Amino acid sequence: MNVERLRFDDVGLALDLQVGDSAGRAALALSAAVGPQALKNTQLVSAWLKFFDEGKTITQAAQTLLDTGAMAALAGGADNASFVQLLYRNVIGQPASAATTEILLQYLDGGGLSRADLFRAVAELPVNQARIDLVGLQKTGLEYAL
């Protein structure tokens, strides 16, 4: 038996929290975009779960955030440097150094990597998995609003 979700009277619990599963992708992407504290917002988690339950990828989530301007609003600017700083701050927990920013900007500005692809790569990093305690979430589940 493979149970992905549990529903209680007041809250749901997502259990499909492997990196490739819907809830796993939602948790990693939400943390990269908004920060790990966003996983405590059950309404936000619910919206992201619905997106990924439709079979969408982290790259598609990033592209949606970019296309709607939500990523620029979160980053405080639409430029590549603001985007890099947002991801680094949310995943690592501190601003990126000038050297790190420059390296990542070379990939983005040179066309070697799209923003959506960089977002996916960063969201799936082991450091992001550790920052949100994905292993712990796999044991307890991720709460979401019904």
Residue ranges and their predicted role:
Residues 1-2:
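Small/polar residue-rich beta-strand/coil "junction" motifs that cap repeat-based extracellular fibers
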Residues 5-146:
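Substrate/cofactor-recognition hotspot
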